């Protein structure tokens, strides 16, 4: 059985192309009042072009867990496995983290050269800042240096242009451990 996740959505993959939203509503008829939305999409990464995946969103995580039950449901007469799913915006949030060393800096005039930036930013590695872009990333050795840089740089002016600095985002090291082809989280 799949582990419980804090989500209010279930995914039902490998549905026939003939399955309708009505079929999904019927499959979850005992939870009709708790259902917020039902969506059917063409299944990606499928060899069979007619397969669909259904998403059923419930009001609460508790409702979702009740509907999950034993992990399967009968849709249009066929037993189908259930998976906990998250909306795309929830999945994206989990893939990035706020960096403890990198700083995103915008508002940099195009004609600013690397020497000026190095003098302004101090001891760091600079990436980005290519011609035509008014932003760059500066990576410091530790979080204390990052904090000092944020305090110093934010609202500073260079060549009359006000700079804006904030901690950068970086990819979370989530790896592929525990991910299966059919796992929709």
UniProtKB/Swiss-Prot annotation:
Where does the signal peptide begin and end?
A: none
Transmembrane stretches in the record are none
Gene Ontology MF annotations: RNA binding
What InterPro entries has UniProt attached to this entry? Answer: Nucleotide-bd_a/b_plait_sf (IPR012677), RBD_domain_sf (IPR035979), RRM_dom (IPR000504)
Looking at the record, the residues that make up the RRM domain are 8-87, 101-170
Cross-referenced SUPFAM superfamilies: RNA-binding domain, RBD
Q: Tell me the keywords, alphabetical order.
A: Repeat, RNA-binding
Superkingdom of the source?
Answer: Eukaryota
Q: Which SMART domains match?
A: RRM
The name under which this protein is listed is RRM domain-containing protein ECU09_1470
Record lineage: Eukaryota, Fungi, Fungi incertae sedis, Microsporidia, Unikaryonidae
């Amino acid at each position: 059985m799949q582990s419980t996740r804090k989500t209010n959505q279930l995914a039902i993959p490998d549905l026939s192309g003939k399955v309708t939203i009505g079929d999904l509503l019927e499959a979850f008829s005992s939870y009709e009042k708790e259902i917020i939305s039902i969506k059917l999409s063409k299944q990606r990464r499928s060899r069979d072009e007619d397969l669909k995946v259904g998403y059923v969103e419930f009001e609460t995580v508790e409702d979702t867990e009740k509907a999950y039950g034993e992990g399967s449901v009968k849709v249009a007469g066929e037993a189908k496995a259930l998976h906990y799913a998250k909306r795309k915006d929830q999945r994206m949030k989990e893939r990035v983290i706020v960096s403890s060393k990198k700083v995103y800096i915008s508002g940099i005039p195009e004609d600013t050269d690397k020497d000026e930036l190095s003098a302004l930013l101090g001891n760091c590695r600079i990436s980005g800042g290519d011609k035509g872009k008014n932003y760059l990333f500066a990576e410091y050795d530790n979080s204390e240096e990052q904090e000092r840089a944020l305090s110093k740089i934010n609202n500073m002016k260079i060549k009359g242009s006000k700079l804006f600095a904030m901690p950068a985002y970086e990819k979370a090291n989530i790896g592929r451990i525990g991910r299966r082809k059919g796992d929709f989280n």
